[in-house]
Amino acid sequence: MCTAATYKTKDFYFGRTLDYEFSYGDEITITPRNFPFKFRHTSECNSHFAMIGMAHIADGYPLYYDAMNEKGLCMAGLNFVGNAVYFEPKNGKENIAQFEFIPYILSHCDSVLQARKKLENLNITNTQFSNKLPCAQLHWIISDRNESLTVESTNDGLKVYDNPVGVLTNNPPFDIQMFMLNNYMALSPKQPENNFGKSAELTTYSRGMGAIGLPGDLSSASRFAKVAFTKLNSVSGDSESESVNQFFHILGAVDQPRGCCEVKDGQYEITIYTSCCNADKGIYYYTTYENHQISAVCMHRENLDSDQLCRYPIQTGEQICYQN
């Protein structure tokens, strides 16, 4: 399971946690402008916007989990098991395989507005990357500094939702997640007043009581509410270090330590990595379960006119600063 969020100070930030019980071997991957995307059902794209993100490279192809392009458009795919449905290619539609969806949108679109137009005639197909890599059951968040969308392909077809909170987790479907936020409308970062009854002399006995009722478990619906509340009430300076620091704290609200989410005997879901993209500067920051030091890759330090992928292995192993 996973959580994605947006955040804006003077720059725009986007990122996600990837929570799972194992890794496929992920790399920070820059796809330059002239890398050929050979889409399965539509024309090959040999010139496009450059992008950077976390990907598994299979047969030289970047299978992105999350990424941003050089124009500041960001996108992430999150588990949507049991609800995601993809279709056979359809005549008259722009047919894009599930694994192509992120590079297709980020190759062609410089904003959510453009992405919205692309989605009007899009069909996400059930074409597998290979027999060893079947379709992942996902839904997606697409964001820029102005707005966010959630995209879900279900039995009812392709659904595109405005996402006013800039947050996505997993099940249930996005419209239900948004509806359930009604349960928390009374929560506040401020201390509560006694509205229980005039005859009951009630007082606060702890800080933070305005948010009593905010979920703390690791279920996707609870993570959605907790990160939405945390993000919407976050306060930070607008420098790069302050903004990045705050973003990691926002997603840290739903960090998964090993042992708290057992998926089968002896196997536990953990937060494998957390990412934070500065979409204005093209910098991809990340931490991993084993390494809490923030690492970064800047796409603009590479040759973005190349036709070859630029790959950086994840930095693992805890980095500890000894002071004596």
Residue ranges and their predicted role:
Residues 92-128, 240-248:
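Proteins synthesized as precursors that undergo proteolytic processing into mature forms
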Residues 1-9, 13, 127-128, 135-136, ...:
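C-terminus-biased signal that marks the final domain/tail of proteins
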Residues 18, 79, 144-146, 155, ...:
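Short, flexible loop/turn elements at secondary-structure junctions
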Residues 15, 77, 151-152, 161, ...:
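Beta-strand residues in well-ordered beta-sheet regions across diverse protein folds
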Residues 20-22, 81-83, 156-159, 166, ...:
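Short, surface-exposed beta-strand-loop junctions and turns on beta-sheet-rich folds
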Residues 1-93, 126, 313-315, 321-324:
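A contiguous strand-loop segment
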Residues 121-159:
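Catalytic cofactor-binding cores of redox enzymes
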